[in-house]
Amino acid sequence: MTQARVTNDVAVGSGGSFASKASAHFKRNRIAWVFGALVLAVGAGLRLYMGMMAFAAGTDYYSPEFQVYWMPLLYGEVIVLSVFTIATSIYLWMTRETDASKIGPELELSRYWKLLGVFSVMGLWAATVAITSVESDAAWHQVTIRDTDFTPTHIIIFYFSLPFLTAMLVPTFIWAHTRLPVYMNRVSIPFLAVVIGILMIMPNYGFNEWGHTFFYAEELFAAPIHWGFVLLGWSLFFFVPLAVQLFMYMGRSISQVAALKHSRQAA
């Protein structure tokens, strides 16, 4: 193993008290814990806001109250997510690593854990969205005085929650393909399929609303214009081969780290 690979490695701790091990655990997984707590707080805040303002000011898009309490939220969501996705993606690409030989097995393994942490946060966010607003979306089409593309649940689901998944996936895709040696200078097909599937839900939503405007007045779950959501939702199945990839690469890195640690102890 080259000296460059060794010097760039992250030290692996051993022994110590429970407190020190817990501290090391939270430090290693701080992305998952901090970001997870943040998305839970955002999800809870949006759900509370919808509970307070949906019926009070969200039943008529053309009412002054809707323009005051819901449209600024929509504009803010679009601006924040656009800036976050573009700025983060550009930063990760501009600071990318070009020499995979400088990434040692310990550093590589720590990055796999970070990647799993980000995926855990995405799963937590998807569950939060499903629990807090998806179940009521179809009902809102029957509740609003004049059914439009802008309802309280639409503003939360289609203009923030689903785009937020894309806002996390795109930078993560770039990070993984510029920081992990196994993905550098190549493309993971399962990873790409997940990103494209979630991304394409947004234009499919536009097609869905166009269809509701001209063809389907009722929210029929099995309507053909809803088939795209099912097909694109199936892209999540690609997480299975992606997980197999990651665990296989992590197993190899763990073996390398264990061998490296043993050689250090022997020396």
Please identify what each model-predicted range represents.
Residues 65-77, 146-160, 221-231:
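Short aromatic-rich membrane-water interface segments that cap or initiate transmembrane helices
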Residues 78-89, 155-173, 235-239:
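Generic alpha-helical transmembrane segments
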Residues 37-55:
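Alpha-helical transmembrane segments of multi-pass membrane proteins
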Residues 79-141, 172-173:
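Internal transmembrane alpha-helix with an interfacial aromatic "cap," most often the third helix
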Residues 52-72:
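Perimembrane loop-to-helix junctions flanking transmembrane segments
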Residues 14-39, 105-121, 179-194, 246-249:
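Alpha-helical transmembrane segments and their helix-start/interface "positive-inside/aromatic belt" motifs
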Residues 122-186:
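Membrane-proximal helix-loop-helix units in multi-pass membrane proteins
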Residues 41-42, 189-267:
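C-terminal transmembrane-bundle signature of multipass membrane proteins
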